[in-house]
């Protein structure tokens, strides 16, 4: 049997992990064992937060729409219900953008929603 020397492979693997851990604090960026654990944990956080980001943005859009709609004297739920009844299909992302950038257009949407206002 020929002797198998794995130094090159191990060094390459270690370098790859340490490169991923570049910028981490202390031993996490220098010691392979600690860096490997840090990189694994970072990957878990990354996976989780890619899904969480979608929820966070939806919350942000709803908050922005709610704030803009209340200036016109309507609640968020009433506004969304009225838009649905009026067959105006604009998603929350675009509504939030309109609320910030184009106040006149948003005011017309709010007035349209007020005319079909839900009964509470």
Curated annotation (Swiss-Prot):
GO MF, one example: structural constituent of ribosome
Record-level GO BP terms: ribosomal large subunit assembly; translation
Record has rRNA-binding as a keyword: yes
UniProt KW Oxidoreductase keyword: no
Family statement: Belongs to the bacterial ribosomal protein bL20 family.
Coiled-coil blocks: none
Protein source organism: Baumannia cicadellinicola subsp. Homalodisca coagulata
Function: Binds directly to 23S ribosomal RNA and is necessary for the in vitro assembly process of the 50S ribosomal subunit. It is not involved in the protein synthesizing functions of that subunit.
GO CC terms, sorted: ribonucleoprotein complex; ribosome
Superkingdom as given in the UniProt entry: Bacteria
One Pfam family here: Ribosomal_L20
Alphabetical UniProt keywords: Ribonucleoprotein, Ribosomal protein, RNA-binding, rRNA-binding
PANTHER family per record: 39S RIBOSOMAL PROTEIN L20
Protein known as: Large ribosomal subunit protein bL20
């Amino acid at each position: 049997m020929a002797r198998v020397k794995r130094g090159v492979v191990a060094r390459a693997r270690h370098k790859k992990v340490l490169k991923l851990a570049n910028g981490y604090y202390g031993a996490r960026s220098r010691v392979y064992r600690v860096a490997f654990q840090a990189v694994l944990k970072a990957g878990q956080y990354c996976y989780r937060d890619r899904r969480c980001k979608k929820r966070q943005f939806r919350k942000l859009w709803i908050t922005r729409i709610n704030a803009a709609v209340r200036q016109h004297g309507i609640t968020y739920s009433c506004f969304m219900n009225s838009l649905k009844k009026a067959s105006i299909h604009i998603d929350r992302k675009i509504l939030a953008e309109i609320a910030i950038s184009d106040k006149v257009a948003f005011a017309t949407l709010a007035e349209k929603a007020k005319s079909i206002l839900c009964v509470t």
